[in-house]
């Protein structure tokens, strides 16, 4: 909750827990591809990880085989995302 005086912020009271609010309900009426932009908002520091788990689960359940090159690219992107997340805190 933010209290403003014109454009100046007077007080700010953070309320935790609203980042994921309603995400499950939004997912009910969308395909996986339509839902991916919402998934990246779960954790804005690790967007590749949230996208990977969202895409890997249906691929595993349906026994979908992705090309080996795509698998390597995913691993590289996940590692770069992990490194960037660690560097943020230095």
Curated annotation (Swiss-Prot):
Subunit annotation: NDH is composed of at least 16 different subunits, 5 of which are encoded in the nucleus.
Species per Swiss-Prot/TrEMBL record: Secale cereale
Keyword Lipoprotein annotated: no
Keywords attached to this entry: Chloroplast, Membrane, NAD, NADP, Plastid, Plastoquinone, Quinone, Thylakoid, Translocase, Transport
Alphabetized PANTHER family for the sequence: NADH DEHYDROGENASE [UBIQUINONE] IRON-SULFUR PROTEIN 2, MITOCHONDRIAL, NADH-UBIQUINONE OXIDOREDUCTASE 49 KDA SUBUNIT
Superkingdom as given in the UniProt entry: Eukaryota
Function: NDH shuttles electrons from NAD(P)H:plastoquinone, via FMN and iron-sulfur (Fe-S) centers, to quinones in the photosynthetic chain and possibly in a chloroplast respiratory chain. The immediate electron acceptor for the enzyme in this species is believed to be plastoquinone. Couples the redox reaction to proton translocation, and thus conserves the redox energy in a proton gradient.
Organism phylogeny: Eukaryota, Viridiplantae, Streptophyta, Embryophyta, Tracheophyta
Catalytic activity entry: a plastoquinone + NADH + (n+1) H(+)(in) = a plastoquinol + NAD(+) + n H(+)(out); a plastoquinone + NADPH + (n+1) H(+)(in) = a plastoquinol + NADP(+) + n H(+)(out)
Protein name: NAD(P)H-quinone oxidoreductase subunit H, chloroplastic
EC number annotated for this UniProt entry: 7.1.1.-
């Amino acid at each position: 909750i933010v209290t403003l005086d014109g454009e100046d912020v007077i007080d700010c009271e953070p309320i935790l827990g609203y980042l994921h609010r309603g995400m499950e309900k939004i997912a009910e009426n969308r395909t996986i591809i339509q839902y991916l932009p919402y998934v990246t908002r779960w954790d804005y520091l690790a967007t590749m990880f949230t996208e990977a788990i969202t895409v890997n689960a249906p691929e595993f359940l349906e026994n979908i085989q992705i090309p080996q090159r795509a698998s390597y690219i995913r691993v590289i992107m996940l590692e770069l995302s992990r490194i960037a997340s660690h560097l943020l805190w230095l």
